[in-house]
């Protein structure tokens, strides 16, 4: 579909040597805009959905003053943050202080380039797409470290140390989870990983959701979800910005849009972790059952529903569990999740070589 649009645009332009030079660059810019505008809208309205859902769970009203049912609240928040003064501490490293938020949000946005929204709907259909996502998202920790160091504050630096240790620790468990999915799917291409979940005995009998990876890889799925919460520094793993100890962690010296960019990166990472869970474990754009009454629903709607359910799980966890101590978080990552995922890796390898291989 993306290639067809590119060729159609090429034919509409007048001929000439410059067309072959200008259109590819213009096409790249159009794809970037087509990705960023909906993503920024989704990130903005995720903040509203979180506040509304938390209000429902805590038996109170969420934001309901700006616009009908509070639907314009994210726009009001954005305008408020845009008009706030950006203050830099006098002892801060000015260049690095500005670079920190940029380094935090760039990987969270760049990884979306290889995310497929349908069998032929992806900005870049890369064969090693899952590996590329892992590589890009691992850079995000540098933004946190730079922000903590450049602020020249003990609270910011301590928060950055906590964040970097936590993110690196849970990246290992998440990496093993993704490796298991790659093994059973036989590919690192995200489109092929989704299509591989449409095969099997259950899918052949029209019960597609039983052939998705969430069922045979249930322990791996649970580890991935919990590691995703920790990786994005969300509650109850948000000791990075523990208000009672270090105020706001590595963001303590930031104000205005500098502060907002860190939150945009956090919510963009939530969407990314959620859509990866939908693609790798929940069948992506595949419908749950093979029914004629469901064929009219586009695949991207199924993918959106599954992604929203996973995102809502993030919010439900925030409303339910108390914050963990830092030593408990490290113990969970190193002493429980990594051994469990290593054991699952060995079991999955033996399962693939056995006569009971269900992924043939």
UniProtKB/Swiss-Prot annotation:
HAMAP family hit by this protein: NDH1_NuoH (MF_01350)
GO molecular function, one term: oxidoreductase activity, acting on NAD(P)H, quinone or similar compound as acceptor
Annotated organism of origin: Verminephrobacter eiseniae (strain EF01-2)
Single GO cellular component term: plasma membrane
Name of this protein: NADH-quinone oxidoreductase subunit H
Function statement: NDH-1 shuttles electrons from NADH, via FMN and iron-sulfur (Fe-S) centers, to quinones in the respiratory chain. The immediate electron acceptor for the enzyme in this species is believed to be ubiquinone. Couples the redox reaction to proton translocation (for every two electrons transferred, four hydrogen ions are translocated across the cytoplasmic membrane), and thus conserves the redox energy in a proton gradient. This subunit may bind ubiquinone.
Similarity annotation: Belongs to the complex I subunit 1 family.
Catalyzed chemical reaction(s): a quinone + NADH + 5 H(+)(in) = a quinol + NAD(+) + 4 H(+)(out)
Chain segments annotated as transmembrane: 20-40, 95-115, 130-150, 176-196, 206-226, 261-281, 297-317, 336-356
Record EC number: 7.1.1.-
Biological processes annotated in GO: aerobic respiration
Signal sequence residues: none
Oligomer status and interactors: NDH-1 is composed of 14 different subunits. Subunits NuoA, H, J, K, L, M, N constitute the membrane sector of the complex.
Compartments in which it is found: Cell inner membrane
Keywords linked to the UniProt accession: Cell inner membrane, Cell membrane, Membrane, NAD, Quinone, Translocase, Transmembrane, Transmembrane helix, Ubiquinone
Enzyme class: translocase
UniProt keyword Transmembrane present: yes
Membrane topology: Multi-pass membrane protein
Tree of life domain: Bacteria
Pfam annotation, one family: NADHdh
